[in-house]
Amino acid sequence: MAEKNRSKLLRLTVRNIGCIGDEGIEIELDNIVCLVGKNNAGKSTILRAYELAKGTVTFDVHRDRHQHAQEDQPSEVLLEVHIPEGIGNVDAKWKYAKDDFLVVKSRWCWDAPSFQRIRTTWDPTAGPEGKGDWAEDSKAGGADSVFSSRLPRPLRIGSLDDAAKTEDMLLTLALTPLFTALEQARSNSESDLARAIASVSQNMQVLSGQHEEHFNIISNRVSAGFKGVFPALDVSLQIGSAPLVPKLSELLKSGSSLRVKDGAAETELSQQGTGARRALFWSMLQVHNELTRDKEVRADFRKGLEKDIADLNKRIVKPAKGVDVAALEEELTNAKAQLQAHDSGGPIPDSPDDPAFPGYLLLIDEPENALHPMAARAAQRHLYKLAESPDWQVVMTTHSPYFINPFEDHTTIVRLERSIEGANAPITPNTYRSDLIEFEGDDKKRLQALQHIDPSFSEVFFGSYPVLVEGDTEHAAFMASILEKQHQLIDRVTIIRARGKAILVPLIKVMTHFKIDFGLVHDADSPFKKNGHRNGMWTENDKIRTSMQAARQAGLTVRHRISIPDFERRLGGEEASKDKPLNAYLQVTQDEVLAKAVQELLTELLSSDQHEPYTSEAIQATGYMPLLIGDVTKWAEQNGLGEDVRFKNQGNA
């Protein structure tokens, strides 16, 4: 398969670089990795660390060295990379099999005081017990430059790259094939271009000859002045021109521009906004590298044909005993025909074994910069589509939920945050991997639908304390109580709408997998429907609590509250109406007592010592569901609904 025939980054570990200290950070890679977290949490440092290891940027002590590192603590980048069979110069002895990959582990260190870049390779069979150790006298791939060429190729797009730089890169990408063709034509003395350049040089010589008398007068005057100082010396002025070697690439770039059509209007790229320029850059980057890959594949195929032809010639000149020379000559003729067809632009024959090449690694900072929300969604789809290619991996840093899609296959989300306050506090990663979480039935499809309807769901990954709610009414009430009142909770919590009670259980699984502490409030609902049938939403109550207990067993702190029978009537309102979110918002905004009650509920969900809706003693004595049934029954009786079919006979619910 093609994805197994591309080098691929599997894991990256960074120590004592940028804001990352000696405790280090380990990032597991996937098709696409989204790095999230507050500013100065190490996201861009991760991208730069790969560039440092690959050698595309140089280690700068003042910029890259962790300020609090001790002198005996090296700055370090460790890569675990899949290096497929077929990539030359990396011996099989350095590879070990893991999850269908052939892994090579290499480490780059920068030690005080010189901070020279030193690479070592993990030998899987070294060490006292043969369980592996860092090799001391050799390394995979030999020379660093050779091994680096086998690694995935990084393409870095910074968040602050200016417009001029972007257009220059775009022009270079677009014109590179033409640059190559022009240089080939200039080096061929028989080409029209080479003859034209030679003609210009000849014309310059002719013009020089026509002005020879004037040149000689100047030469004599210079010589006379010079001999006045040094009588024994003479000087002559020789007029001529150096060979004309025009910088074709600069001439082309200075005269070229990219044009953007918008209906009937056509403008230069420099007249477009930053977002349009960045989006065009991503698109051209992908196309350029696909063309480059095609060129590499064709060159590799041609090299193989040339080798076959050379081998066949040798076997024909000195045939082994019993060899059918006529058959060899026919094979040689076919190989030469293939080479001729290939050089004429013919397609490469299909092969079950794709040639092995380094993959590409797109390192992009804050792709949301300067993009309209609609464009941001389109850009997200573009980047995820790019990551589906076996040639590409994408690692992005982002502060936008529009670029997070946790339910796309082969997606990893890593939140970087400091475990405590302080510039030297350790940075700890929380990792979510879409392929490692198991959903039941159509839960994943429901979550994908939720993500499409409301991309703000992905705010759960960005750092503040998430509170899960069923829908828009709770969201409106909570937002009114903290936004309109400018409550201190405004910067501490994120309200996440499930848009349906049945979505809460899979959302709890997401939180548990990502290891995020959270709060949850939902409706109790009635045990029965208006027709007397069992209410599926009542059954969800027990499922939700079971999921909450599983989250606690995984080490999370989760706080759980229930609205009896629903959030609208918890606020003192009527049963749900179509305008309930707006009504709830206005009600909480205008009623100070109600606003305070909602704030207290939110505070409980954030920091209460009681994590369950009921005390542990009450649950142990009576049971969770009997307590809930009792509360709902009591509410129904107090509100004149004791005989309502939805609430009676609850002992059988």
Features from the language model and the residues they span:
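Post-Walker A helix-loop "phosphate-sensing" segment adjacent to the P-loop in P-loop NTPases
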Residues: A53-H62, N289-D294, A387-P390
